[in-house]
Amino acid sequence: MQKGIMVSSDNLFKDYNNLENIDFVFVRAGYTDFNKSKTKKLDTKFYENYNLALDKKLNVGVYYESCATNLKEAEDEINYLLDIIKDKKINYPVIIQIEDDHNTIIYHPNSQKNTNKDHLLEIVLYQIKKLNEYGYNPVIKTYETWYKNIFKGKITNIKFFLDNNIEYFDDIY
């Protein structure tokens, strides 16, 4: 069984010299901010984390934190992600994180939590299709309840990574 980590500017892995039990790393490429303008942002540590993982000869995947609530936003996010990862050595899956459950006055009034289940399914199917078209192996990271209530049985050709907030996660293959 393989063991891996997820790293980002929010969740730095401090010691890349102590990775004897780590086989792969997922580096956050970027995210859509859940502010009112839903700004797409590059993770400020993407290139550093990506290069450190390559230097340590780890298998590398990436992830993007989606806030898409319609197909136009999903298209914009996927194009943004594809632009970030083009020409990168990605030999592990590309994870789309579907966990936007923010909905307050401060944040954008539309969140994935409040999106119609059929529309959210359509968004995820679009994201999977686009990643497949570009030769990537997509994985969807989401809450267990969202998986059971929205995706289970409706998307069968990919893996899901169910968020249980642990530091390390075991092989997703």
Segments and roles (model prediction):
Residues 12-21, 43-58, 81-90:
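Acidic (Asp/Glu)-rich catalytic clusters
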